[in-house]
Amino acid sequence: MDTSATSPDGTQPEMSPAVAAALASADGISDWISKHHPGKVMETRNHRLAAPYFAVCLEYRQAALLLISQNMRASAFALWRPTYENYMRGHWALNVAGDNDFQKIAKTKAVPKFDTVIKALDGKSGMFAKTKAKLWSPMSDFAHGGINLLARWSGPDGIGSNHPDGEVLDLVVRLNAYGLLASMGINYMAGEHGLSESIFVEKVSAVLSGIKALP
């Protein structure tokens, strides 16, 4: 079995112009997020729970983009799920978590399961379970060695990273959306010192206009 299709560290030798352009655009979004990151948020229990989730989402996004820039695509895709999950948990903590949730967290010293979070969010909008159902299987495969990951590391030329550029471009779009949404949550918690939600909605809509379906 030929394993020469990839270098020992799992990287690919070249980056396409399309991926390079997407990363440049993502860097611009990162700079914008950083520029509009409020220094403080209002102190409430919901904000205290939500803020770390949003912050971790932003860090994972940056890490995934860095990995893509180094052509370490499998590692970048492994961060897709936790980036998404931390944003969703932050959204739940900010907008849905109530007295019973905080009492359970204090009693059990554990946060709710992700399915519980999604169900609680669906009580408000009804769309989150459908999104999770569509994305969870490939997300989990890439994070935990499932069939989608194996299919991109085994081919006619041997064993090596073979994540198509199109999938990488879609991942960058998703990462940008999660980052902007997390930043929107942080700005909301800053009250009058944060940017208005409408500004973020416009930017997220512009980002998502180019998205394609991942497998």
Protein language model features and the residues they cover:
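Short runs of predominantly hydrophobic/aromatic residues within well-ordered alpha helices
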Residues: A50, A76, W80, K132-W136
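Active-site oxyanion-binding pockets that recognize sulfate/phosphate
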Residues: H47, R73, D165
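Short, contiguous, well-structured surface segments enriched in hydrophobic/aromatic residues
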Residues: G28-L67
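Short, hydrophobic, well-ordered secondary-structure elements
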Residues: F54-N95
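Long, charged low-complexity segments
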Residues: M1-T44, N100-P215
